Amino acid sequence: YKSPDELCEVVDKYRELKVPLDGIIQDWQYWGCNENWNSMKFQNPRYINKMGDPEYMKFLPNGEDKNADYGTPRIKSPKEMIDYVHKQNAHIMISVWASFGPWTEMYQKMDSLKALLHFETWPRKAGVKPYDPYNPAARDIYWAAMKKNIFDLGMDAWWLDSTEPDHMDIKDQDFNTQTYLGSFRRVHNAFPLMSNKGVYEHQRATTSDKRVFLLTRSSFLGQQRYASHSWSGDVTSEWSVMRKQLAAGLNYALCGIPYWNTDLGGFFAWRYNNNVNNIAYHELHVRWYQWGVFQPIMRSHNSSPVAVEIYQFGKKGDWSYDALEKYTHLRYRLLPYIYSTSWEVTSKAGSIMRPLMMDFPKDKKVLDMDTEYMFGRNFLVRPVTDSLYTWQDKKQNGHQKDMSKIGKTDVYLPQGARWIDFWTGQTLEGGQTLQREVPIDIMPIYVRAGSILPWGPAVQYSTEKKWDNLTIRIYPGANAEFTLYEDEFDNYNYEKGAYSTITLKWNDQDRTLTIDDRKGSYKGMLKSRKFNLIVVEPGKGCGDGDSTTFDKSISYRGKKVIAKL
């Protein structure tokens, strides 16, 4: 986004369309031109209502027309922009890089400390240099600027870009560059670890009222302890790339790095002529977006000129818009499940995306399977990674096929469990490959028999409604257990024990659900709530809609309850 008005108008549009949204990202160039790269200040005149002011026009980003009439801005300052987003019950993240342009105060300070790495980085030919995150004094300077110029305005989260860092025109001698901990050759791979560490530790020392959230392009082993959420970089919008992203995410999980995501739809849409109206791109984006529901972080992103807000894909009644809207709502209905699974990651060193070998080690067919995985312990997810409803001509223009001819995709159901189709409620035996019909709005999702799923309310943002009236879907066929985790949602009081857990247990033979005593407490905790219980079967408790009838509704006040179903 190139101005506060543009960013805030996107939030407005989502609220107007009643499509859920929790976060929006201010990407680069709020600082201005490349020579002023990553000044960690809002110096672009469009962000501070200084268009036409000679003192600030020198910072206008490269390529923007100095004589263009942008009109009188509605949002006139960065603080006003951040406050506006907050009033719309959303959060804002901002891009911060690991390098600095020669005009910046940060460049001068790092240079005086001998904490710049002197090799070519991006953007080229602007004199930009990476900093030395191995140097604790450099990390102090880095955070001090972030805090003073951005965090103190109310910023919620950080996009730490180029944490490799970008290394252009690579020469072997570049790796002999000296850092605080020795040659760059020796410590290169730990660059993101140290850069993320600096931001995390400084923000934690500043306040415990706001959780640290770091989105970073690169990772190193152990980086998860710094609230680091990795994304897979600027990947191209192609079906083959989407397939490879699946393997990438699962490999991250196997390295013990649980929070990972990919640019939904890909970043560079070259293969679609950089045209968001290309119908073939719509199909790819929809399928990638559907998969995003079952990633630890769900986030759309693309490179200009392609914009990927939902309204770029048509309107209600258009298949691409409807599919995107459907899966956005599905993500929000799964929040109690996802948040509880995240607690398992924190408390038990678990993972959210789970390669099938983790849960089915005796099934040799899944040992190297990279087309499907478990999302938490209950969901089997099989993203659709082939084009079924569009095609492209030699000029890469997209064309739509007859969508009444439903395509299919292979799904393998692992041995050692029975599986219930999330959409239909049909129970299937494990150890078989089936051909699942996949209309454009259906991605294959199966729930392990012997699962308990808390189904959240329909909301426009994650904390809009309390979880005081939850549907509990029980997938029969085996005993089940699930622990519902809750806390204050945005501080570190949980580290001091301020949280609660409620364990639900299903006895399949007796068809009884036991809801144990609630353990723990926190400020604002619900004292009473309703659990609406439903045992899933075909036509009952299926899919992404609300159930209108239940097997039993229970008023729960924190004491053990047993329900016969």
PLM segments and residue spans:
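Catalytic-domain carbohydrate-binding cleft regions of carbohydrate-active enzymes
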Residues: 1-442, 447-448
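Accessory, solvent-exposed terminal regions and/or long lumenal/extracellular loops of proteins
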Residues: 442-565
